[in-house]
């Protein structure tokens, strides 16, 4: 009986640990207050700064699954802890 109980506790613990998702700031402006629960597999937060000749700089923050190469006039940083892209 103790073995069965221990097995159930271990399975429950593994289920809870594997179900935790990253949280990241998610917005399209300089002031970023929204926190997003990332989808499964998205273990990175990013901050993308886009330089535009007309409007200056635009900042986008959110969740990502992989690190992508920045485009022209972009600077992208990635991090792997909760809300690290603030």
Swiss-Prot record:
The keyword Secreted applies. It comes from Dispholidus typus (Boomslang). Disulfide bonds join 24-45, 38-63, 79-84. Expressed by the venom gland. InterPro entries: Snake_3FTx, Snake_toxin-like_sf, Toxin_cobra-type. The keyword Signal applies. It is found in: Secreted. This is Toxin 3FTx-Dis4. Belongs to the three-finger toxin family. Ancestral subfamily. GO terms for cellular component: extracellular region. Residues 1-19 form the signal peptide. Pfam families: Toxin_cobra-type. Its main location: secreted. SUPFAM superfamilies: Snake toxin-like. Keywords: Disulfide bond, Secreted, Signal, Toxin. One of its GO terms (molecular function) is toxin activity.
